[in-house]
Amino acid sequence: MKHITFSETEKFKYALLIKESALSYKEIKTHYIDHINKDILAVSLKYNSENKAPAILMKEYSEELLKGVDSLGVELLIVADSNYFKFLTKAKKADSFGYIKDCAIKGFNHIKVTLSVNYQALFHNPTLKDKLILSNNLIKNYINNTYVPLGINIIHSSKYPNTIKEIKQELSNLHKYPMISCDVETYGLNLENNDIGTIAFAWDKHNGIAFKVKMHQLSNLVKKELKEFFLKYTGTIIYHNATFDIKMLIYVLFMDNPLDYKGTITGLNLFYKRMHDTKIIIYLCTNNAAGNKLGLKHNSYEFAGDYSLKEIKDITKVNQDTLLEYNLIDCLSTWYVFDKFYPKLIKENQLNIYENLMLNSLKIITNMELVGLPINPDKLKKTSEELHTFLNSLIRRLEAFNIIKDYEEVLVQKACEEANMKLKRKKKTIDDFNIKFNPNSGKQLQGLLYEFMGLPILEYTDKGQPATGANTLKNLLNHTNNKNYQEIINTLIEITKVSKIVSTFIPAFNNGYLKQDNRIYLHGSFNLGGTVSGRLSSNSP
């Protein structure tokens, strides 16, 4: 165990734990000590020769480490290592920057633990600098007895109107603010059978309102008041991920039915008249080669802390009072993010791109999401049947190759041997097994290509397994002159392509939104700022 000291004291209340490769006097002083306190002991963390820290290694090393720092009077461990932080606190994730936790190791629960950043990571991901600054400030406040957990007291005033009269009054009060933020909590992410459970508004990062919509026993009256408010409000509304909130507001408040295109256009023209989207602002301000995170909670973390709810994917499982406060904090955080990044947007001369390209594109995207892609169910069924027939013919073609038949015998022999190794008395024979080659089995495909056929391994998966994807199969064609091998590989490529359509696209099409015109509609969720390159992406589907 190696260590570095920065003062002449013999007792230390605070210890920085960091990988031995990062245990540098100059770097630790520059990135931590100069910003916090010189009376900090820096201690190395052990990793094996493969630069990994398995649980058994951390367990053995932590016992020695904790005894050592405890004998020196250490009260707080500053852990600049995600693996050791999770081990010491039993946390599932290492993302709780800005919080003080108890050490979970028996006998050392009196020691506090906080997460920091290894300065070496800044070279690959400069955006981690904000986390390091946040961590340093937290520790400094803790030492000075001024530590306050993130997110505490960010709500200065809040109202949760419940009666129609109260809701109407609070909505009326919003008209005096030239700019407000808005956020909705819904029953799901798709349009079908969805609705707005609650809605919140805020006029700055500390004050706002939230109330029930569909969850209200008089939901139709609440929706009527909401629609009237949006029609009359002349200010600017800030959203985070505006396409979702606006899409749901139009769908719930302005469309009489899922095919009401007139209501769609009315809503689009209304909501996109004066608005901001902090997700797009963040994208323009932070886009870089290392990648960026556009989520509201990530970008407001130093303000609101970790206020996420595990049950938020199903709002019916969340206490309604808790949900309303959560909804409001989303609005407050939206304001915080706007105040944080909008000045930077202007300073970087990106206002023209933001207003004339990005925001205009959001209106088009929301229209696309609401209208959807129509599919003829009869033609979908026919296409599905044809694809399944074609896939079966490809599999029969593959099974007809003698090489595949020989490989199936190998699979049977192997299965028989493995079964008999587990049996003590009664033994099995190859006649007890009927194994067909499964081209969708990565393990079997690896065995066929690289062991039985002896083809070279060209690339590996992220998990270190020999790759067998369509692109790899295409490349393998250039590494054999055997005509049978080439025919088998070409057949496997076709099977891979058709299988993907049959197993991925067809089910998604069948699960689309069946509307009154007897057509199935696909409603995507498009991400304008979801990629480094700026291309449009989609999810669900």
Model regions: which residues?
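Residue-level signal for well-ordered alpha-helical positions
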Residues: 90-91, 126-128, 252, 287, ...
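A polyanion-binding, active-site-adjacent surface
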Residues: 1-148
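Phosphate- and divalent-cation-binding pockets in alpha/beta enzyme and binding domains
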Residues: 86-87, 247-251, 448
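Conserved "right-hand" nucleotidyltransferase catalytic core of DNA-directed polymerases
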Residues: 141-213, 266, 271, 291, ...
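Active-site catalytic pocket residues across diverse enzymes, especially alpha/beta-hydrolases
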Residues: 91-92, 253-257, 341
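Alpha-helix capping/helix-boundary segments
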Residues: 83-85, 244, 444
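Short glycine-rich phosphate-binding loop at a beta-alpha junction
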Residues: 75-80, 235-243, 438
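Conserved RNase H-like, two-metal-ion catalytic cores of nucleic-acid enzymes
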Residues: 9, 13-16, 21-41, 149-298, ...
